[in-house]
C-alpha cells in the first residue's frame, strides 16, 4: 500500500466543517450534554467541539450529533460524531453511539499532546475521557476503543519516562491498558473504580482526586 497524505482539500473541508459545527454549539443540546459531563467551555473551545445543527452537504447523516474534530498540525484530519441522546444506544436497532466518515481509520485523539515537553503522558479510551483528563491538568492522548490502538502507535510513546493508561473500571477497560502494557515496559495502568470511567470518576470525586489517582 502506498502512502498518500490527506489532501489539502480534504483538510480544508474538515476545518470548515469543524468551524461550522463549533459555531452551532452555543445553546445546543450538545452544549448541554458537555455541561452535564462536566466539560468546560474552555475545553469545548480548545477541542473545537461542535453540534451538527445544519449539516454541510454530505454530512446530513450526522445531524443532531456532537462533532469531535481530530486535529493535528496540518489541521482537522477527521471528525467523529457522538450520539448525545439519553437512550442506551445499544438498545436501538441499526444505531451506534459513534459515527465516523467512510475511510476514516484509527487515529490518536489530541495528538498535539505529543508535541509538549512533558516526561509523562496518559492514554485514555475515548475522546470524552481524554478531554476530561486534559482539563484536569493531565497531558493525555486517546483512542476510540482498544481495537484502535495500532502497533505503530507504540513508537509514538517511546521516549517518555512513563505512560499511564487510565482504564475504565470494567473488564473491557483493561483491554486497551493491557494492549499497551504488553508492548511498552514503561507503561503502567491506573484503573478507575468499579463501573466508572475517567469522566464519571471526575464528576463523582473531582479534579484533585483524579490527579492524585492518576499520579499527576
Ligand atoms: Zn444513541
Across the structure, where does each feature detected by a protein language model lie?
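TOPRIM metal-binding catalytic domain and adjacent DNA-binding surface shared by DnaG-type primases
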Residues: 1-66, 115-116, 184, 216
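Hydrophobic anchor at the start of a short beta-strand
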Residues: 140-141, 163, 186-189
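A residue-level signal for conserved active-site and pocket-lining positions in enzyme catalytic cores
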Residues: 34, 74, 165, 198
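Short, acidic/turn-prone active-site loops that include or flank metal/cofactor-
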Residues: 144-149, 168-171, 192-195
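Phosphate-handling DNA/RNA-contact segment within nucleic-acid enzymes
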Residues: 10, 53-161, 176-177
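Short, aromatic/basic amphipathic alpha-helical patches
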Residues: 175-184
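Acidic beta-strand-to-loop metal/phosphate-binding motif
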Residues: 123, 160-172, 191
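Metal-dependent DNA phosphodiester-chemistry modules and their immediately adjacent helices/loops
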Residues: 204-216
Amino acid at each position: 500500500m502506498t502512502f498518500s497524505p490527506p489532501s489539502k482539500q480534504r483538510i480544508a473541508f474538515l476545518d470548515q466543517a469543524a468551524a461550522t459545527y463549533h459555531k452551532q454549539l452555543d445553546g445546543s443540546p450538545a452544549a448541554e450534554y458537555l455541561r452535564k459531563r462536566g466539560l468546560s467551555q474552555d475545553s469545548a473551545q480548545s477541542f473545537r467541539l461542535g453540534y451538527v445543527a445544519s449539516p454541510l452537504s454530505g454530512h446530513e447523516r450526522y445531524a443532531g450529533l456532537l462533532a469531535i474534530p481530530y486535529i493535528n498540525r496540518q489541521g482537522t484530519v477527521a471528525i467523529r460524531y457522538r450520539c448525545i441522546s439519553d437512550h442506551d444506544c445499544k438498545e436501538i436497532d441499526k444505531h451506534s453511539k459513534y459515527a465516523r466518515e467512510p475511510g476514516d481509520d484509527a487515529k490518536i485523539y489530541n495528538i498535539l499532546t505529543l508535541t509538549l515537553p512533558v516526561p509523562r503522558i496518559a492514554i485514555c479510551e475515548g475522546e470524552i475521557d481524554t478531554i476530561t483528563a486534559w482539563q484536569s491538568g493531565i497531558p493525555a492522548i486517546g483512542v476510540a476503543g482498544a481495537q484502535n490502538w495500532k502497533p505503530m502507535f507504540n513508537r509514538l510513546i517511546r521516549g517518555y519516562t512513563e505512560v499511564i493508561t487510565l482504564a475504565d473500571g470494567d473488564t473491557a477497560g483493561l483491554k486497551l491498558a493491557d494492549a499497551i502494557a504488553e508492548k511498552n515496559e514503561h507503561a503502567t495502568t491506573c484503573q478507575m473504580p468499579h463501573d466508572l470511567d475517567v469522566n464519571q470518576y471526575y464528576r463523582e470525586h473531582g479534579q484533585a482526586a483524579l490527579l492524585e489517582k492518576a499520579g499527576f
